[in-house]
Amino acid sequence: MAQPELDLSKAPAHWGMNFTETTHQQPSRSIDPSNVTFPQGYTVVVIGAGKGIGEHIAKAYVQARAENIIITSRTGSDLDRVKKELETLAQQTGQAVKVSTLVQDATKPESYTKLKDLLEEGFNGRLDTLVFCAGGGPVGTLWTPRIDETDVDEWNESIALNFTGSYYAAKYLVPLMLRPQSQGKTIVNITSAASHFTGGNITPASYSIGKLALNRFTQILGENYADQGLVVVAVHPGSSPTPGALGSMPPSLHNILTDDQGLCGAVCVWISKKKREWISGRYICATWDMDELESKKEEIVKEDKLKWRMAV
């Protein structure tokens, strides 16, 4: 079946693509990570940093002079490459940055116990910001709009990669984040605007469902630990020509891949650099103007916006 082109500028209002009047395809000056300096010892974990959005998120935290960066991926060669690039970038900031790597299958709980051990042994159990960026667009049978034609194993893998791993990350790593030495207490879950979609010929159902579950989990996690200062935000990273997107999306949908891969990283740093309890449990788009978003703070909190609910 031919895939239709997708024009996000004509998206329904409830998708929230234009929640701020101003939108961006590249980081604006006000969220430039290079203008940020995190406190001494600041420790960041980026799960799924071997390429694409995750790689650029890690780069943004290096630009912001986070002292410790731990990156994970399934592929060791990707981690080796990204580590070298991060270390080169760190030299340009004039601040020493320790980059550590862990080969990890984000769908397996034992991967997170290993990550916890790494943080305990190498970083005094400190974890300030956790970015869950594992995920990916489905391939194979999952692009069919007919559920009966999908492969069960491909379906389960897609859900595990785009959602279940975030549960494992929270279960094993949140206890570290609640310790006194972990000052940032921030989780960013990389979601997708696809969580709004229901048409299987535009985005696979398993991907939409996985990201929708991630959004609700973000809200639940934020509410669970609000009294302990944990801030949890779901971020749509924009639509970027990442290796994953280009490799999984039909060519007819490549027209929407126009956002800079570094945009999401800049927004993640913006979330981390200051306590923003008012956006905890909510969904935001990296393409939004963050100054405009902050100006809507009272409206967002009063009307409890940017959360999933049923229209009745």
UniProtKB/Swiss-Prot annotation:
Gene3D superfamilies, per the entry: NAD(P)-binding Rossmann-like Domain
One Gene Ontology molecular-function label: oxidoreductase activity, acting on the CH-OH group of donors, NAD or NADP as acceptor
Binding site for NADP(+): 46-47, 171, 207, 211, 242
Keyword terms of this UniProt record: NADP, Oxidoreductase
Pfam families: adh_short
Pathway connected to this protein: Pigment biosynthesis; Secondary metabolite biosynthesis
Catalytic residues, chain numbering: 207, 211
Up-regulation conditions: Expression is significantly up-regulated at the end of late growth phase, in the presence of Butyrolactone I. Expression is positively regulated by the pgm cluster-specific transcription factor pgmR.
Record-linked SUPFAM superfamilies: NAD(P)-binding Rossmann-fold domains
Top-level taxon in the UniProt lineage: Eukaryota
Reported phenotype of the disruption mutant: Only abolishes the production of pleosporalin A but not of the 2 other final products.
The enzyme's E.C. designation: 1.1.1.-
Similarity field: Belongs to the short-chain dehydrogenases/reductases (SDR) family.
Function as written in the Swiss-Prot or TrEMBL entry: Short chain dehydrogenase; part of the gene cluster that mediates the biosynthesis of pleosporalin A, ascomycone A, as well as a third cryptic naphthoquinone derived pigment, all responsible for the coloration of conidia. Essential for the production of pleosporalin A, but not the 2 other final products. The pathway begins with the biosynthesis of the cyclized heptaketide 3-acetonyl-1,6,8-trihydroxy-2-naphthaldehyde by the NR-PKS pgmA.
Protein name per Swiss-Prot or TrEMBL: Short chain dehydrogenase pgmD
